[in-house]
């Protein structure tokens, strides 16, 4: 197959390796009288999840991406682009940069390409690739961008080392992750807290870490990056922000928790009545007297120049 050009970078179109990556549906298999969980993307692969990702991206553009922009001519690697929920924002904010967005899922890439075309953007190319077998030479990219990816990986430190090797000296690595342990809300609800914990536990069962946001600084330093800075980005919602009550509390966070209902019950983490009560109480925080807080973490590090 022919190679393709992204900006001034030539990308080798090689077959995918067979390494396991994170973008696969969560599944439980019956083994005797127990359920075992396979390594997977805990939120699943289906149209409703794709819609949730789009809602999340739309609600969080200013909070997460207002300070992300790349110089003209830069070649930027976006790892784990999924359905392009963040890609459109990146491309719009840096119209003269060249983006190569990769994902393991052909279906997600097809949807991402459609979104880019619909937005009239021409500075993005897509490539199907495994995160631990990226077909690029070292020091190929001016910048690397990763959003909501590390939480799904069993080896996030190894992934960051790979991304750092792909950076040119003085290039930046930007990582954004959430932390479900940062969630607080009113009215308080033990059932809602238990429902959130089901998601945290399921993600741990499949090798991920829903609490990874708090670990970004040590992870980036361990990867060898310099001048690492991590900033908390808190989503605060009350009745004065009905837009966020709908877009974030209902369509993003609670939809994400509700999406693991069947898996949590099958895994024996909860029962249907308890889980459903928790989801109802999360929706309750979007009412006129409710309050909801959640913190994302954005880390940026620079690859040092050789001594």
Question: Predicted segment positions?
Answer:
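Class I SAM-dependent methyltransferase Rossmann-like catalytic core
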Residues: 38-58
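C-terminal helical/coil "lid" or tail adjacent to the Rossmann-like core of SAM-dependent
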Residues: 40-42, 48, 229-290
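Conserved alpha-helix/loop element of class I SAM-dependent methyltransferases that forms part
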Residues: 55-74, 89
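Class I SAM-dependent methyltransferase SAM/SAH-binding core
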Residues: 77, 83-133
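A short acidic, Gly/Pro-enriched loop at the edge of an enzyme's catalytic core
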Residues: 132-143
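A short SAM/SAH-binding and catalytic strip from SAM-dependent methyltransferases
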Residues: 142-156
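A short glycine-rich, Lys/Arg-flanked "PGG" loop and its adjoining helix->strand segment in the class I
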Residues: 157-172
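Conserved catalytic/acceptor-binding region of the Class I
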Residues: 174-242, 251
């Amino acid at each position: 197959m022919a190679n393709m050009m992204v900006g001034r970078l030539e990308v080798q179109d090689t077959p995918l390796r067979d390494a396991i990556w994170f973008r696969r549906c969560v599944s439980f298999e019956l083994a005797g009288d127990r359920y075992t969980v396979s390594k997977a993307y805990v939120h699943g692969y289906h149209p409703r999840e794709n819609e949730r990702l789009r809602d999340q991206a739309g609600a969080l553009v200013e909070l997460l991406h207002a300070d992300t922009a790349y110089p003209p001519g830069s070649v930027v690697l976006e790892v784990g682009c999924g359905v392009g929920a963040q890609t459109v924002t990146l491309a719009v904010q840096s119209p003269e940069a060249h983006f190569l967005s990769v994902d393991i899922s052909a279906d997600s890439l097809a949807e991402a390409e459609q979104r880019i075309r619909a937005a009239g953007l021409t500075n993005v190319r897509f490539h199907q690739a495994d995160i631990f077998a990226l077909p690029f030479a070292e020091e190929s990219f001016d910048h690397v961008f990763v959003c909501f990816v590390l939480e799904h990986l069993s080896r996030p430190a190894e992934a960051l080392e790979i991304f750092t090797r792909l950076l040119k000296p003085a290039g930046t690595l930007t990582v954004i992750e959430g932390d479900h342990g940062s969630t607080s809300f009113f009215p308080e609800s033990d059932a809602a807290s238990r429902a959130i914990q089901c998601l945290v536990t399921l993600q741990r069962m499949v090798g991920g870490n829903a609490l990874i946001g708090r670990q970004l600084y040590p992870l980036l330093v361990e990867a060898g990056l310099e001048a690492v800075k991590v900033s908390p980005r808190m989503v605060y919602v009350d009745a004065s922000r009905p837009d966020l009550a709908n877009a974030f509390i209902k369509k993003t966070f609670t939809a994400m928790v509700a999406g693991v209902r069947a898996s949590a019950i099958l895994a024996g983490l909860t029962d249907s009545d308890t889980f459903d009560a928790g989801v109802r109480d999360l929706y309750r925080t979007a009412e006129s007297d409710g309050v909801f807080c959640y913190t994302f973490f954005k880390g940026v590090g620079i690859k040092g120049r050789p001594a």
